[in-house]
């Protein structure tokens, strides 16, 4: 049995890839149970399943009832915020709030919400700004921390966070890939910073990650996305490998499909760059995460 303890703060377990479906086509049999088992074997004790919009938040919540280790978030991703307008913003917000406050044993955060100016083709900037701000209503009403997203929108993100910081108990900016100055601004707001494969692509990314105090770090996979690729600066620091096939085979990972078990690889890169003991770092991160999302739960 492993000595490591992990909470994967961002895992997209509602994604069809974990059921063998890629781009709408069934490519292999449903291996969801195997994916979860591999994660448990490396020490993942809790999985926080990301809600990307109202429908996805409902699906994530439904999934949480299948295992005691599963929890979820409720919110609307910046690229999907046009749904507020499409369905009526008051009604949409009310539905998100109902889902949040009526499932307090399983919903641990408001999100995924924030700003994504890299993908404005999915949702205009003005719409993203309006409905990121609105989702602080959810955080304030529920008393839950926030699971936050920021891509190429640091200035606007920080501005909204500063104006609304007192309305939420705390939060984590997940999949962080910003500069050292960006990280410092988030730390000044007493936010946590989530690290996954997308946070470890370049030498600069590694230096930024190294600069973040360990008591402000969290860890995630964002699977099936954001895996550590061979071209990433951190890849050479990975010690743990998993049997992987290009074509699916039972008992194996699938090439290019990130899994929650790969959280151990994220830790290995982080610990090597920071020159810290992996077990000590994992324990610090586990406690950070437990404090934000689970400490005050009944």
Curated annotation (Swiss-Prot):
It is an enzyme of class 3 (hydrolase). Keywords: Hydrolase, Metal-binding, Nuclease, Nucleus. A divalent metal cation 1 binds at residues 112, 222. Disruption phenotype: Morpholino knockdown in the embryo results in an abnormal cell cycle progression, formation of polyploidy and aberrant chromatin structures. Consequently, the morphants have disordered eye cell layers and significantly smaller eyes compared to the wild-type counterpart. GO terms for cellular component: nucleus. The keyword Nuclease applies. CDD domains: TatD_DNAse. It is found in: Nucleus. A divalent metal cation 2 binds at residues 112, 149, 174. It holds the Pfam family TatD_DNase. GO terms for molecular function: 3'-5'-DNA exonuclease activity; deoxyribonuclease I activity; metal ion binding. Its EC number is 3.1.21.-. Coiled coil: none annotated. Its cofactor is a divalent metal cation. One of its GO terms (biological process) is eye development. Its main location: nucleus. InterPro entries: Metal_Hydrolase, TatD-like, TatD-type_Hydrolase. Deoxyribonuclease which catalyzes (in vitro) the decatenation of kinetoplast DNA, which are circular DNA catenated to each other, producing linear DNA molecules. Plays an important role in chromosomal segregation and cell cycle progression during eye development probably via its DNA decatenation activity. Belongs to the metallo-dependent hydrolases superfamily. TatD-type hydrolase family. This is Deoxyribonuclease TATDN1. The lineage of its organism: Eukaryota, Metazoa, Chordata, Craniata, Vertebrata.
């Amino acid at each position: 049995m492993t000595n490591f303890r992990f909470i994967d703060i961002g895992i997209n377990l509602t994604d069809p890839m974990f059921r063998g479906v890629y781009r709408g086509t069934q490519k292999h049999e449903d291996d969801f149970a195997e994916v979860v088992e591999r994660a448990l074997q490396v020490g993942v004790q809790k999985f926080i399943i990301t809600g990307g919009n109202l429908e996805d938040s409902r699906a994530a919540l439904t999934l949480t009832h299948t295992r005691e280790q599963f929890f979820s978030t409720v919110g609307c991703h910046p690229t999907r915020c046009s749904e507020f307008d499409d369905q009526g913003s008051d009604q949409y917000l009310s539905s998100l709030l109902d889902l949040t406050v009526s499932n307090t044993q399983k919903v641990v955060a408001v999100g995924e919400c924030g700003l994504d100016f890299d993908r404005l083709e999915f949702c205009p900037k003005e719409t993203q700004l309006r409905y990121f701000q609105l989702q602080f209503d959810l955080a304030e009403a529920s008393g839950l921390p926030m699971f936050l997203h920021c891509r190429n929108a640091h200035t606007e993100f920080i501005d909204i966070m500063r104006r609304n910081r007192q309305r939420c108990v705390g939060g984590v900016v997940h999949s962080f890939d910003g500069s050292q100055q960006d990280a410092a601004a988030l730390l000044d707001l007493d936010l946590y910073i989530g690290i996954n494969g997308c946070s470890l692509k370049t030498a600069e990314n590694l230096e930024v990650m190294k600069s973040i105090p360990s008591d402000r770090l969290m860890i995630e996979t964002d699977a099936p996305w954001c895996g550590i690729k061979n071209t990433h600066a951190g890849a050479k620091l990975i010690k743990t490998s998993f049997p992987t096939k290009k074509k699916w085979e039972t008992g194996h990972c699938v090439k290019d499909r990130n899994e929650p078990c790969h959280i151990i690889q994220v830790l290995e890169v982080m610990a090597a760059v920071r020159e810290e003991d992996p077990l000590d770092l994992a324990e610090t991160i586990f406690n950070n995460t437990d404090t934000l999302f689970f400490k005050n739960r009944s």
